Amino acid sequence: IAPHPDDETLGCGGTIFKHKRRGDNVYLAIITSVKVIKDQNNNIINFYKDTVTQKSENKKIKKFYNFKKIFYLDHPTTRLDVTPLGDIVKSIDNTIKEIKPEVIYLPSPFDLHTDHHVTVKATLSCTKWFRNKSIKRVLGYEVLSETNFNHHGGNFKPNVYVDISSFLQKKVNAMKIYKTEFKKHPFPRSIEAIKSLAILRGSESGFKAAEGFHLYIDRSDID
């Protein structure tokens, strides 16, 4: 689950490729809209890049990851905090009920962006076992330029690591598809930053490169 396109790649791109290699069906739900939204006076109150560019990037990213399907939930970008929470919860819950996922990845609770905060709150309300029994595990990912810029709140402390040593370059290549979000160092979303974070998480977990996650829920059974 990504508040915005590219969050999934920054947060769990390598892990997505590992799921695909294992033969898992992987879906992407993008919470916010690429549409231009206007008020009654025809003034733009919300926009997300150029819609043509964004749709092109989404098409390319779907093919690159070979997602089973991308769900566009069409909530307004940067305005989730003033959008009725029930509407967001309902759209996420409907998506979960359609695909019945076993594992969900979503942002960490420590990101600065309000869209990320609301996405976490809305998604977690859908993960109660009696609402969606298929869910076994829920993990929070970190997003460069959001998670690492929370200098005064709670800090992201990964307690789950996934070895992405064989998929780090593919993660970088996926991020390059988002041309307007990907820039040269020292921009937070750069090749150097992505690789450096993966190497750091790898050094914490005994891998050459890794992605770190915050474990929200684990309902795994012990055989």
Question: What is the meaning of each model-derived region?
Answer:
Residues 10-11, 53, 87:
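Short, conserved clusters of charged catalytic residues that mark active-site
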Residues 58-61:
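Conserved SAM-binding loop
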Residues 34-36, 75-78:
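A short, flexible beta-alpha/helix-coil linker loop
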Residues 29, 70-73:
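Short beta-strand segments at enzyme active-site cores
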Residues 1-5, 9-47:
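ATP-dependent adenylation/pyrophosphate-handling site
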Residues 1, 18, 22, 45-49, ...:
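Metal-dependent de-N-acetylase/amidase catalytic core
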